[in-house]
Amino acid sequence: MSDKKNVLNGVQTVVLDLDGTLYDKTGLSRRMVRALWWSLPLMAIDRLAHGGLWRWIVSTRWHQRVYLPTMVRLIGEGCPRRENVLALVAEAKRKGLQLAIYSDYGSIREKLAVLGIDAKDFDLLISAPELGDLKPSKACAEEVLRRLKAKPETTLFVGDRDEKDGESARAVGAKFLLI
């Protein structure tokens, strides 16, 4: 990350992961468990033993109603921004490159807001579930490029997980920067 100008040579589009890339998520999982344990009734935990927890989560919209809002709040309360990545974003913006967020999770606008990042700086905000799958999905990565009208050979994916973000980039023939 130290030589960000060379990283952007020949690049016209930068596709960034959000969680763990734009902020340091160290300790977030533990804080999430502590914050959310109360929201899963014993009945739901019992259903886990019988394979019904996922059905309960979906039927009650727990993920959208409880999990994601809690995650957004905790990110705002204690996850520092990765200033080196934001410097790369600023340099890409200064150069007039296309910028996109391609996340494995929802609530993208809300997360950007609590991090003090303007969603308007990005040409596309999209999550893999909105595209019908999870990373690394070649079809999802291709759809991101299609929506941006971007060529793989001039696109740089930036992320914190090679097995997800890097695989997505390689699947479509794009460059990848692991932070």
Placement of each model-derived feature along the sequence:
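Glycine-rich phosphate-binding loop signature in dinucleotide/nucleotide-binding domains
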Residues: 7-9, 95-97, 148-154
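Short, acidic loop-to-helix structural element flanking the phosphoryl-transfer center
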Residues: 10, 72-101, 138
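Metal-dependent phosphoesterase signature
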Residues: 51-87
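Substrate-recognition "cap/lid" segment bordering the active-site pocket of phosphatases
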Residues: 102-156, 164
